[in-house]
Amino acid sequence: MDRRSLLMSPALLAAPAYAQGARARTLRFMPQAGLSALDPIFNPTTIVTTHGFCVFDTLYGADRALRPHPQMAAGHEVSADALTWRITLREGLRFHDGDPVRARDCVASIRRWAVRDGFGQVLMQATAELSAADDRTIVFRLRRPFPALLDALAKPGSSPCFMMPERLASQPADRPITEAVGSGPWKFLPGEFVPGASAAYLRNERYIPRDEPAEAAAGGKRVHFDRLELTWIPDGGTAAAALRTGEIDWIEYPLPDLVPVLDRDRNTKTQIYDPNGFLGFLRFNCLYPPFNDVRLRRAIRDVIVQPDFMQAVALPQDWQECHAMFPCGLPNVVESTPATRGVAAMDRARAALREAGYRGEPIVHINPSDFPAVTQQGRLTVDLMRRLGVNMEVVESDWATIIARRANRAPPAQGGWNLHNTNGPAATIANPAVSWAIRMHGAAAWPGWPEDAGVEEQVAAWVQAPDVAAQEAAMKKLQELLWEAVPIAPTGLFRLRTAFRADLTGVLQAPNPMLWNLRRS
């Protein structure tokens, strides 16, 4: 039985729904992957960040246009010379264990986050002193003006600056915490956690939402359900059938070929997940041959036919070509002119393989088997590389296992890797300060570990630009350098659709699913 037939099965359509009382009190959500870790600072993948937004809160939150707004903060004051920022916490904030949220908890949380996050590292380089003046006041004393301070604290994806109790935040950043206690709108239930399969949460009755309307990660995080369940269903067809029968309320990413079926069903709805979209790309491991040779990375970039990759993950109206190192459509992003495709490009790539010293050694491509927006792109990469004459060794596994292997710096034959397909929500790679995909600072870089001093100098020029004109000039020059340095090879920009029960209202558009503002009509 194929997926469409499965969805139309009379047995499934006739399956009894949960009792109305239980359904009214419980929100059942199927994320893009199974939750296997609890620390969104140590493991900033989308699924762990989704969990993080449930359990933890942030000092500032970003709206759909990525503008920062106070969240845990009541507000802030900036000195006349722009070198001292004083952030005041809202009154009455408490952690799930009952302890009050204090400024020293936030200071410890910011420090731990900044060790692992690129934007955080840039912020701390500009910070001479970070301290708690009293229980409700956080003080940044800067070495130089840093107008993007609130943008750093409000970044909505790929390691948001979540606030934790000091006892957790004081733990080393290179080791994950195993206790999920925050001050967010949901309380994690450790006794019901099955790594990779399911997680459960209770509404935080002590949570004090802001008065403003909810928008993305900003505004009032009002929870109207008593209980939240995250359930991972590996098969997309089974998940869609469960949505149609009411066994689950929301699927983060339905399979693209099932979206038309869900749109036709009066009991289900779909909408664009995040209007800013996702940039797909191929990541190279620059530590080892042959992709430590930039000439080969350029050649592989130029044989990627983006429509092939995009058609595999999104509906025709939901993707576009994007020959850029930042998501197309965002401010100051400039596309490069793609090289001539076809036979000539393939011949150039084969020549580049020879020049890089490739002699038929196995090239390890790691690919998740349970993440449709990545899985199909990875398989297309494998096919492309084989057509170039590369001896491909394919490692497909669940997303959590691939994430663990991706972090392994060992040689490919000893548990490491050469190639990896993935994507980034536009908000998490929107500019040089937040983008983990373009940084080229060697061992400190995102897995792939590329190194290019010129790129890093230009990132610094953007961050330290004294005015808008200088920042725009720095951005233009940086994109030129990145296109030649090739830390990633873009495969296109696409917008995914999310699917939910028609009686579920208040689904927000954001880089992550925001599990508040939801009601059952």
For the regions a protein language model found, what residue spans apply to each?
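Long beta-strand-rich cores associated with HINT superfamily self-processing modules
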Residues: F500-S521
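Ligand-site clamp/hinge motif
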Residues: P209-V261, N391
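Ligand/substrate-recognition segments at binding pockets and active sites
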Residues: A197, D235, P254, W319, ...
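Structural transition elements
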Residues: W186, Q317-E355, S369-Q376
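Extracytoplasmic/peripheral linker and loop segments enriched in polar/acidic and small residues
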Residues: G342, L388, E393-A407, P432-A502, ...
